[in-house]
Amino acid sequence: VPLEEDPANKWYQRAGFPLELSGREKKKLDERKAEVMPEDTACIMFTSGTTSRPKGVMLSHFSLVNNSAEIARQMHWSQKDKLCISVPLFHCFGITAGILCCIHSGAQAHLLKYYKTVDVLEQVEKYRCTVLNGVPTMFLAILHNQNRSQYDLSSLKSGIIAGSPVLPVEYQEICRELGMKHLQVSYGQTEASPCIAISDYEDSLELKSHTAGRPIPDIEFAVQQSDVIRNESMEG
């Protein structure tokens, strides 16, 4: 087996190939790890934010790793879970609350190339997915799909609903119809990698339908008006 271009035309026997390769890979990994610092930029995510023109947001390794670890912990995800990832991977929702959370928790990741309601229904039924994240319009599209009753979605247990506001009556209907007791309402922004607040896992559906949750660890909130910090009970 030719491992790589070698001036001496060195070849490796099949039996020794895995050991040689793993040794080289470990050395490369150790060298790379020594070069990377937690505060270094891991990726650049684009967000339109308050304008229609996309802006690049530099997210650090520290921010992405810690945010996803906390999401996985708050959601109680484990190796027993299977995530149906239907949100795009070019967005924090897909990367942080999807791929990275699976790495932290050991959960399976089932990816969809594009979002189509019927594809989500088929994926959940086929792989018995336990977790489904999405924006309110995605959940409502599933809810109102005329063929939904033809699919077995009983495996769904939890997920995150975020990205835009959802009416209390709509949220409760989604939870009730899909049987998702632990569909957690969350608030975030790309600059925060993205989760800022999330409802408590054991909060009632009534409470979760009227709140975006509590701040996660290492997140600080401030109510501000005209550069003046306001009290918690005041508007800002």
What are these regions (language model features)?
Residues 39-52, 57, 68, 72, ...:
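ATP phosphate-binding P-loop of adenylate-forming
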Residues 7, 12-17, 23-46, 53, ...:
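Conserved pre-ATP/AMP-binding loop-to-beta segment of ANL
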Residues 41, 47-50, 83, 89, ...:
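Conserved S/T- and glycine-rich ATP-binding loop of Class I adenylate-forming
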Residues 222-236:
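Conserved beta-loop-beta connector loops within the AMP-binding
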Residues 129-134, 143-207, 220:
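Gly/Ser/Thr-rich phosphate-binding loop
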Residues 65-82, 90-131, 145-146:
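Conserved AMP-binding/adenylation subdomain of ANL enzymes
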Residues 1, 55-58, 85, 107-114, ...:
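Short beta-strand->loop structural element characteristic of the AMP-binding/adenylate-forming
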